[in-house]
Amino acid sequence: MLPIAIGICMKYNKMNYFKHETAIVDEPCTIGEGTKIWHFSHIMSNCTIGEKCNIGQNVVISPEVVLGNNVKVQNNVSIYTGVTCDDDVFLGPSMVFTNVINPRSAINRRDQYAKTHVGKGASIGANATIVCGHDIGEYAFIGAGAVVTKTIPDFALVVGNPAKQLGWVGEYGHRLEFNADGIAVCPESHQEYKLENNKVIKIKD
């Protein structure tokens, strides 16, 4: 679930989050308790950032972006208007979002920003590119350097340019090996999953 308002950052002397002295936080915005914002990052106005997020160095978060709780944003990431991330999302170093399908310097297309939604628990690897207008499913895993040009289903593992699906992963990020009955077990959590009609679902908590 996306966060509700948890701490307006208009009164810096009452912040319930950490902001490095070189970081810039524009007003108004909402930043959750326990979030950390590191060197040279810029949080623009009207953003919503949940609790216990970690915003790395040299990160830009554009107006009206929404991040859930416990989102990890690594160094050198720009998150543009139109992007929303649910809880527990991981954005790897220097990964890229876009928000206009056909940008031109001489043509203002600010009213044509395409939306991108990243589902709960998904991971996007270093230097990956997410072309706007395509959603990333829950717990999906986008490999380093991948270029995503279509919507990615829950639990999918994708790599390459353009990104192609190699298989499936569980909530802990391990690749799932399905037996003849379509059942797989995570080697770490022992969670069971079922593959049916090209969709993966949890079948046992």
Residue ranges and their predicted role:
Residues 154-160, 169-178:
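Short, intrinsically disordered, charge-biased short linear motifs at domain edges
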Residues 54, 123, 141, 157-159:
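Short-chain dehydrogenase/reductase
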Residues 165-168, 184:
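Cys/His-enriched microdomains
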Residues 170, 186-189:
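Short cysteine-rich clusters marking metal-coordination/redox-active sites
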Residues 15-21, 27-29, 36-135, 167:
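Flexible, glycine/small-residue-enriched loop-and-beta-strand segment within the central core
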Residues 178-179, 194-196:
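Short, non-ligating residues that shape and space the ligands of small metal-coordination modules
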